[in-house]
Amino acid sequence: MRNIALFLTYLGTDYHGWQVQKNLPTVAETVEKACAMIVGHSVHVTGCGRTDAGVHARCYVANFRTTSTIPCERLPYALNTHLPQDIVVTKAFEVHENFNAIGSCVRKEYTHQIYNSRLKDPFYVNRAWFYPKHLDEKIMQEAASQFVGTHDFAAVRSVGTDVKSTVRTVYYYNVERKGDLITLKVCANGFLYNMARAMAGTVVYAAEGKIKPEEIGKILESGNRTAAGPTVPPGGLYMTHLWYDDGIEKFECGSDWTE
């Protein structure tokens, strides 16, 4: 039995997230159906994370097992003929039998786009969070920096997924403005449910003056979800970089992309 890893990119607007859900369109189900048509048997595709409904991926890693002998270099072209235009497989390669797209991943990066202008731009609909009130990116960076390090992130997660621990390590959280577009890039060894979106909401809260950047440490210590900022809309959030190192496989799937 071969274990095949896939690199994908997709727009999440028309899907209820990655994870298969009964009677709802999801990215995983769509990919599984395409794989089954190519390899000639049903497959289970394991993804690197459960992206929420409406969240996009500039890079995403999944794996599945198959008895098919189709060469890996042909798989992307074959699969893409059976996938909709908003999901694309960019690479396929064989990995060792114990490789797991989520378990072997050691770091993830999400990028959040905020379109900060008084006028909407139709080309950013579902691609960036439209926010008409001016935001000071310097204050946002000061707030974002408070999240860096190893902390209990229970205050910036939504209840919905059971986890053994809410402690995570954030390696960087960078804020950059180019014209009306503000980009937030956050990298961690893992993310809790809605954690990236709640962190972005907290950073915006600080820019609005609703909390002070230096208060974020105490908010994290409190574990109180209501003390942090809101969970922002999903349309501006993208998975953009993944790091793998399980002692055998070591590679990255990444994109330096911003609009």
Where do the language-model regions lie?
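Structured-RNA-binding interfaces characteristic of tRNA pseudouridine synthases
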Residues: M1-E259
